[in-house]
Amino acid sequence: MSKAKEGDYGSIKKVSGPVVVADNMGGSAMYELVRVGTGELIGEIIRLEGDTATIQVYEETSGLTVGDGVLRTKQPLSVDLGPGILGNIFDGIQRPLKAIADVSGDVFIPRGVNVPSLDQTKQWEFHPSSYRVGDRVTGGDIIGTVPENTLLDHKVMLIPQAKGTITYIAPAGNYNINERIIEVEFQGTKYEYCMKQSWPVRSPRPVVEKLLADTPLLTGQRVLDSLFPGVRGGTCAIPGAFGCGKTVISQALSKYSNSDGIVYVGCGERGNEMAEVLMDFPQLTMTMPDGREESIMKRTTLVANTSNMPVAAREASIYTGITLSEYFRDMGYNFAMMADSTSRWAEALREISGRLAEMPADSGYPAYLGARLASFYERSGRVACIGSPEREGSVTIVGAVSPPGGDFSDPVTSATLGIVQVFWGLDKKLAQRKHFPSVNWLISYSKYLNALEPFYEKFDNDFVDIRQVAREVLQKEDELNEIVQLVGKDALAESDKIILETADFLKEDYLAQNSFTKYDKYCPFYKSVGMMRNIVTFHRLATQAIERTATGNSDGQKLLSNIIKAKLGDLLYKVSSQKFEDPSDGESVVTGRLNELNDELKEKFRALEDEYS
């Protein structure tokens, strides 16, 4: 603060919780970063009227008094982007929690603490690309790589605004993130750039164009991959009441999805949930294609913003997370961002809106809730990145929503459903029956089915038909359940009894998945397809056999559903035990066993038909 001029200071006029009003702030900009009070608390200007500025403070404001100084920094709230992001744990405004703990020696974050986001002293191994002195470069060009860890190479890019002719490029060697690695001349002026760049969190990073997303986001959860798929570069919402398993699904996506990396934002969640994530993730490993085990933290960045942290920082944490994701997207990677949960973010907006005395809309939320949600979700997508070499990257956003009492007509849920393309609705009743993941297959939907058809055709040409049959069976079973409750199961036609039997296989043995077992915590797509094919094959063959033997055999005996269950009991047990196939045995082994079961089903039903026709 000593270097600041007197004209850079305003003075506090009023304090109301996280909102501070300051005078003498003429010349300030919207969303400018300020330092409030003697403790230099971080704040951001959110309203300007004349020379009065309204500031939201990202730290605890108790102890601030009228007349305290407010220092303008003349820059927006920004995040530092460079090597060292992966494997790190930040708070909502990108302060590194581990570094703060080391500096302060305390379990709580001290007020006004000023620790650099990325390690300034660590030496990174820089490998320059093919550029030479005299070459012309522009924003987004990859000027070198840094092997950040064994999973990801960090591509060092020029900042988007840069352009000119190279006058110096650093040779291969070890540098910290603030050392000059390239110098560019443009119109007679020289500019120096290092590995680190800053970017304002509220501004989307520039791209050449948005592209159509056509690759599925495989999560390892059968119900999501087969019935309600998301895409890389898509938007998904997971609304559900407390205890439905939102956090488990979010964490499963972080652990097993086919993204290159994950940014997990715990926005206003319980402290012990975030602690569990922080304890679990460093111990988790993922198996690479070449068989080696790697720590999952090597591809993960955590933004931890628990419910007892200042409310204003919740709003910033979402923007921090999406800016980090966009940075890796610009390198040409496919990143996924988990926001758990956007409801807490909306509650932070509501609280600050109330402090500003804005006109409340539905349930007290501000009228601009929908616009803020849309501007956040619209930063997802598959894009052609700026700079050379030409490359594509994507950011997928998965937002958990916690509607009070599981009421999906809540304003946050309604606004979210108007924006996102995939809806994974969690059902309290399924969760109470211990059916997890508790995704309700009757209300959930995905608008990406048509976009993904070419992928499915290539992977397995009859998967689309199999999935359609499975969905019809589940829909029909819901209608039949009402009849069964009125008149009992015995009054149903034989073909309807088969529908109920197939639906049981689908619900109990296919859609339900145990995240805490070795064989079922992650289900590869080939296993999902094989399992669904066998269940649908049973349905088709059983229905066909009953229709063909409707007249009975020479003794007048007809093939009934209970006879099928009695005669093929062992085979049906095999169908229900498919989930126990362990993916670690290898794709060819698992696929071979599932195909054998399919052949056995056809053979046994052929024999049954011969017996009863």
Swiss-Prot record:
GO molecular function: ATP binding; ATP hydrolysis activity; proton-transporting ATPase activity, rotational mechanism
UniProt binding sites for ATP: G240, A241, F242, G243, C244, G245, K246, T247
Superkingdom to which the source organism belongs: Eukaryota
One GO term (biological process): ATP metabolic process
Enzyme's top EC category: translocase
Complexes and interactors: V-ATPase is a heteromultimeric enzyme composed of a peripheral catalytic V1 complex (main components: subunits A, B, C, D, E, and F) attached to an integral membrane V0 proton pore complex (main component: the proteolipid protein).
Protein name as annotated: V-type proton ATPase catalytic subunit A isoform 2
Taxonomic lineage of the native organism: Eukaryota, Viridiplantae, Chlorophyta, Ulvophyceae, TCBD clade
